[in-house]
Amino acid sequence: MNDTEKPADTASEEEDFGDPRTYDPDFKGPVSNRSCTDVLCCMIFLLCIVGYIVLGLVAWVHGDPRRAAYPTDSQGHFCGQKGTPNENKTILFYFNLLRCTSPSVLLNLQCPTTQICVSKCPEKFLTYVEMQLLYTKDKSHWEDYRQFCKTTAKPVKSLTQLLLDDDCPTAIFPSKPFLQRCFPDFSTKNGTLTIGSQIVFQDGNGGTRSVIELRDAANGINKLLDAKSLGLKVFEDYATTWYWILIGLMIAMVLSWIFLILLRFIAGCLFWVFMIGVIGIIGYGIWHCYQQYTNLQEHPRSVLTVYDIGIQTNISMYFELQQTWFTLMIILCIIEVIVILMLIFLRNRIRVAIILLKEGSKAIGYVPSTLVYPALTFILLSICICYWVVTAVFLATSGVPVYKVIAPEGHCIHENQTCDPEIFNTTEIAKACPGALCNFAFYGGKSLYHQYIPTFHVYNLFVFLWLINFVIALGQCALAGAFATYYWAMKKPDDIPRYPLFTAFGRAIRYHTGSLAFGSLIIALIQMFKIVLEYLNHRLKRTENTLSKFLQCCLRCCFWCLENAIKFLNRNAYIMIAIYGRNFCRSAKDAFNLLMRNVLKVAVTDEVTYFVLFLGKILVAGSIGVLAFLFFTQRLPVIAQGPASLNYYWVPLLTVILGSYLIAHGFFSVYAMCVETIFICFLEDLERNDGSTARPYYVSQPLLKIFQEENLQTKQQ
């Protein structure tokens, strides 16, 4: 049976999915006679962009990024702001950190204790009563202690009066600044968590408290700081290593270029280089984790868990735990096994992958400008991300300071009500709830704009998702048009028009903005549902309802499958749009029917190639990552002058690895779109033509031959 003959069951399936393409002597690839498609969706998309710009301008007028950059004390004043009394007081200090374990921390998004700005954190244990005893002998002790008190504090007040006025903390303990806040200076001694070599301390109220309680309190505060930066040390590391990071990223770009060039000539050999390289890099990671795990067995303190040490100002402490390296080793072992199993089960399709890689290399060789297109995508995505972040920051910092009643003891019927700190002590609330505080809570307001800020946040996120998916869709459609032009050129490169990528990009923008917006809107809606689902999961993660957890897991799985299926269909729809210029729904239907009419050939499609390209990305990122690890940890004696001593070597290391992967993804995504476009055009070619002299195939003979062999084997089975 030759390739043009079809069994009866296949013919009936094709009737269900439309008629095959017929021969058209005038068809020479992407049509030039087009009209605008999905105009209504285009208009809605443009209106949303205009609204997005207006929202950004309004947020810029009302917002104040200083509220995100500086910590705010209980009076709503910024710590460290220039031109204010707190200019030299850059750190936020909590009077009673132990109160941050209260459930009201999550309810009010604020720790129920007085907070002031200080210039430095305490360096020793000292209670207020002990300070008073020392003050009678040496007045300088008050000068040290008053740094952590209000300006109205006096050293002669009794402890009872001090608690009533809330002028000073009852006790201080060794702390270090982290995220511009004073956190306990934790350390380990003989496997035990300590602060200043102590495991217990006096709280200033006559009680003895453990270090574990302080750790829990610090963790409670940390839940409120998840949107803050990692601190000054991270920026110091970036300032020291930025040029080395750029060098690493340039090496990744050159390496990606080299791989793409080599794929055209030695695709088979390079395939096995990918396989062996990825397995080797993961194997090295397993060996390194095992070595670190073995070495740490000699240190008693390494038996602590991440939960035991809690939040740390020195993140390197986590890498001093056996648990960290053991977990990383297990993860890498699982990845290694998955890669090896996939190679075993996909071994029969390696030939298809190699041929498709060669065909993709030829196409890119004839249209080299496609390798530059990822730079445009990167620029557009960067603009979208920056605008979204800036708008979100200005929205989050819009409004005026809002103060709320906080009862440290938790026994006040007026708790969580708004208040005015200027007159709070004279109000009925202060009389009804002795010890209650009127502390800064957040920035808000009662105007119409402030009431709709949560809605604006949702709109900001949704349009952001729509825009980034549109940018990706635009790139896929433009690349598909360029590669389709290559495929349908009978004599290459003579029949390939000049500037195919520029022409395809212009067609996509001029005629098909609405169709691309339609497809990206569907993906954005699915992603919004996923985000809402994750939000609900976060709110309900402490529930013990097994049914609820099961339903959440099922919904996650369903949305993940739906998103990937829609993305696959959208890519093929964009290819059809690039070739025929029809609207999104018609193009998606045509692409789906084409794939279903050729379901046997789809069984040997380019999915294996995607896997190979993914391994190529891992190989590039892993190779640069290993080199960066050896360099930033000063284990490369070949380079005499490396980076200076770093606070956290993993900061530039992770940046280089992530950046290298994104660069490799940008280059290899062009390859992936090329392969998918060639495959769709190949299916159309088989339906339009029969290989005769009058109707010759446009596909190359090696690719045609291997697909005919695969189809024959499938039919025989």
From Swiss-Prot:
Q: Which InterPro entries would you find in this protein's record? A: Choline_transptr-like
- Glycosylated residues (UniProt): 88, 190, 314
- What does the record list as GO biological process? phosphatidylcholine biosynthetic process
Look up and give the membrane topology term.
Multi-pass membrane protein
Q: Which GO terms describe its molecular function?
A: antiporter activity; choline transmembrane transporter activity
Q: Which residues lie on this side of the membrane: Cytoplasmic?
A: 1-38, 264-265, 347-351, 396-460, 537-610, 671-717
Q: Which reaction does it catalyse?
A: choline(out) + n H(+)(in) = choline(in) + n H(+)(out)
Name where it's found. Answer: Cell membrane
Q: Does the keyword Cell cycle apply?
A: no
Which ranges sit in the Extracellular compartment? 60-242, 287-325, 373-374, 482-515, 632-649
Question: What is one GO cellular-component annotation here?
Answer: plasma membrane
Q: Where is this region: Disordered?
A: 1-24
* Keyword annotations from UniProtKB, A to Z: Antiport, Cell membrane, Glycoprotein, Membrane, Transmembrane, Transmembrane helix, Transport
Q: Among its keywords, does the record have S-adenosyl-L-methionine?
A: no
Q: Where are the transmembrane segments?
A: 39-59, 243-263, 266-286, 326-346, 352-372, 375-395, 461-481, 516-536, 611-631, 650-670
Q: What is its main location?
A: membrane
Q: Describe the family membership recorded for this protein in Swiss-Prot or TrEMBL.
A: Belongs to the CTL (choline transporter-like) family.
As for what it does, the entry says:
Choline/H+ antiporter.
Protein name as annotated: Choline transporter-like protein 5
Specify the species: Macaca fascicularis (Crab-eating macaque)
Which gene is this protein's source? SLC44A5
